[in-house]
Amino acid sequence: MEIEPIAFFRSPFATKFGIPKQSGLADTLHGTIEFVPKYRNADALRGMEDFDYLWLVWEFSANKHEATSPVVRPPRLGGNTKVGVFATRSPFRPNRLGLSSVRIDRIDYDAADGPLIHVLGADLMNGTPIYDIKPYVTYADSHPDARSGFVDATAARRLHVVFPDNLASGFTAEELASLKKVLALDPRPQYHDNPTKVYGMEFANRDVRFRVEGDRLEVVEIG
């Protein structure tokens, strides 16, 4: 079987740094699914408006390294503990496929390159190829009592974000709300803890620079 992209994702993230580690963590983060001409057909989306969430099957396109090891070091475990690759969601896997659950915001059938699917809560980089889209079905896909392995014991913390008003003026209200949620997730590598280091990430075509001390993240510059 050969597969090809059916669409590409548009998001505020031009690089991998800063992207939420999982979908849904920054639930207001907006993105758009743009179909390639071959699949730009409104009939293929008929009935989609009756669902709230979608599954996206996509490629870790920024990861060009061939996966050869059966184990990886999840950042959530500090980057030292080895876990089987198929017991993680690491991008370093044989077929480089990712799976994300996103909320449907709206479907634009009238756009010039439509139909476009506007979604919230994705964890994809701008330009990510999408190979399949499926509806999220609650009765089959939701398992609220399921165990989550090492993830259960390493709950992600949330930082207090200090974003000076004079630095926030270049963003729309929607962008600013989403950016604050992304920053609260602590975009740094899990093992970094230098309170004097200034980190930078690109968001919505702006360079966002910040530092973290304890549970406090302060935005210090917008470029």
Feature-to-residue mapping (PLM):
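Mixed-charge, low-complexity intrinsically disordered regions
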Residues: 1-97, 109-223
